[in-house]
UniProtKB/Swiss-Prot annotation:
Superkingdom assignment: Bacteria
Family: Belongs to the universal ribosomal protein uS13 family.
InterPro entries to which the protein is assigned, alphabetical: Rbsml_uS13_C (IPR027437), Ribosomal_uS13 (IPR001892), Ribosomal_uS13-like_H2TH (IPR010979), Ribosomal_uS13_bac-type (IPR019980), Ribosomal_uS13_CS (IPR018269)
Keywords, sorted A to Z: Ribonucleoprotein, Ribosomal protein, RNA-binding, rRNA-binding, tRNA-binding
Gene3D superfamilies named in the record: 1.10.8.50, 30s ribosomal protein s13, domain 2
Subunit and interaction comment: Part of the 30S ribosomal subunit. Forms a loose heterodimer with protein S19. Forms two bridges to the 50S subunit in the 70S ribosome.
Function field: Located at the top of the head of the 30S subunit, it contacts several helices of the 16S rRNA. In the 70S ribosome it contacts the 23S rRNA (bridge B1a) and protein L5 of the 50S subunit (bridge B1b), connecting the 2 subunits; these bridges are implicated in subunit movement. Contacts the tRNAs in the A and P-sites.
GO molecular function term, any single one: tRNA binding
Source organism per UniProt: Histophilus somni (strain 129Pt) (Haemophilus somnus)
Protein name from the UniProt record: Small ribosomal subunit protein uS13
Pfam families, A to Z: Ribosomal_S13
A cellular-component GO term for this protein: cytosol
Length: 118
């Protein structure tokens, strides 16, 4: 297994799909990385030479991925909480942040229903 950005990349998958195992890299970015490294998208990771894997590592290194990206997202949410702005309050209360309705629905964010005790 090749190791890129601290993640073991699955050998048996195509390069584009394997790169999506890294947090912060989706299909579009994976295709761009493969193109920049000069690697065909349909080549499996186990068929790549060590030099090609190093090129992939260099290309992935240009982006914020994995732990750094998770930390950045967490700090952004923490900043909103500290500011006390509307979005921060919604995060604090565990409600939808982007204007979705909450009278019905929003169960994913709110969690399971709590029964009313009489």
């Amino acid at each position: 297994m090749a190791r890129i950005a601290g993640i073991n990349i699955p050998d048996q998958k195509h390069a584009v799909i394997a790169l999506t195992a890294i947090y912060g890299i989706g299909k579009t970015r994976a295709k761009a990385i493969c193109a920049a490294a000069g690697i065909a998208e349909d080549v499996k990771i186990r068929e790549l030479s060590e030099e090609q894997i190093d090129k992939l590592r260099d290309e992935v290194g240009k982006f914020t991925v994995e732990g750094d990206l998770r930390r950045e997202v967490t700090l952004n949410i923490k900043r909103l909480l500290d500011l006390g702005c509307y979005r921060g309050l919604r995060h604090r209360r565990g409600l939808p942040v982007r204007g979705q309705r909450t009278k019905t629905n929003a169960r994913t964010r709110k969690g399971p229903r709590k029964p009313i005790k009489k």
